[in-house]
Every structure is written in C-alpha cells, then in structure tokens.
C-alpha cells in the first residue's frame, strides 16, 4: 500500500517472483479481484495484492510481508482526516505477528516513524538503510543488487519502487 507507487511496486514484486519460477497471483486494487480465484490457489502459490486505504479500513488481518511505499495527504474527501487515512494504511501491518516483515520508505516522514511487530526493513534513496543507493547501485544489506541506470522505467520515484520490491522479496528470490 501507499499513496503513490502501489501498482508499479506490486507489479515489480510479482514479476521478480515469477522470474524465480514462483506461481504468483496478482490482484486487489490493481484490477483483478482475488477472492473469486482463491479455490484455484495452491498452498505454495504466492499472492501479491495492492491494497487501498478503503480496502484496509476494516481489515483485521495482515499479510506476512507488507510494503508501505510512502504516505501523503490523499482521499481526504473520503477519510475524515489525515489520521484516519494513516490509521487505515497501518492495518496492512498492525496484525502481523513476530515473524512478519514490514518494508518502509525511510525518506517519507510518516512511514519512517512506523514500526512493525516483526522485522522492519527500510529503503532509502537519500541515506543509509537496509536497501539504499551506493555509487549509483541499489544495494541490499551492503551487497550490490541493481545499477540504477538499468532501471528503464523513468522517474526517481520508480527507483524507490524497485527498492521497495527488492527489499520485500529477499529470501524468496536469488
């Protein structure tokens, strides 16, 4: 989830997992409702789901792995205030247990203050974090992963989307 970058990040995660040979179900706010497809899913399959604040408002369960790309004032015509919007977004990790993974943008003032119940990993374009940029290369835990010049989708924000995806797929892809 996030204010911006949800669809791109969800798609990147899905493609990274598929490239590793995983069976991936992509859906949610991205256009495909997954609920009707759950009977076709196998226990070893992975679901990558884009969730909006509206979908998260009443959620009482959280996924094992969650990403919050960034948060900024959004949908305030629907939410009574910014705090209600932020609280809805927090539901993506609020119910994780100690084995959960939460991925957050350290460069966003709101998400930088969040902490999960399990492991919390940060990505940052501007400073040191678990996933950061060193000499033009996205690095995860100090190891080079991807030169930023190889990212063909234009825009600095898409570097952040890649960083979020690279962080959350750790342990699932080589």
Predicted regions and their residues:
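Adenine nucleotide phosphate-binding catalytic loops in nucleotide-utilizing enzymes
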Residues: 80-83, 90, 119-174
